[in-house]
Amino acid sequence: MVAGKPALSLDAKTLAAMPHEEVTVSAHDEAASQWRGVKLEDVLARAGVSLDKPLRGRALASFVRVTAADQYQVVFGLADLDPTLGHTQVLLVDSRDGKALDKDGPVRLLVPGDKRPARWVRNVTAIEVVDGGTTARP
C-alpha cells in the first residue's frame, strides 16, 4: 500500500511472472538453500514507488513496512533500498531448492546480506510504503 495510490495486490501467478533472482543462503543453523524470488524494488516500482532516480529531501525519511500473517514486522528505509545509497538486496521469494514454499509461504522476504535472518519474514501479508517525511513530532 502506497499512501495516495490504490493498493496493489499481487497473487502467486503475477509474482511468478515477474523477473526472478537466485541466491544461496542459510537461515539460523540450517544448511544453505537456493532461494528464488523477486526484488522488493521491482514490486515497489509496480506499486508506483520507483527507485530509478536518487532519493532526495523528504523521500529519504520514507520507509517500507513488511508484515507477516502472525503480525511480525520489519522496516526498511527507502534509502536502504536506493541503488545510489544502501542498495540492500531484499527479495520476496516464492521457492526454496526448486520447490514452492510450504509453511513459510506462499511468499517469504529474505535479506541475503544480513548476518542473521532477523529481518526475514515468513508468510508476508502486506507491504506498505510510509511517508516518514512529515515535520510533525509526537
Where are these regions (language model features)?
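N-terminal intrinsically disordered, low-complexity segments enriched in P/E/S/T
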Residues: M1-P138
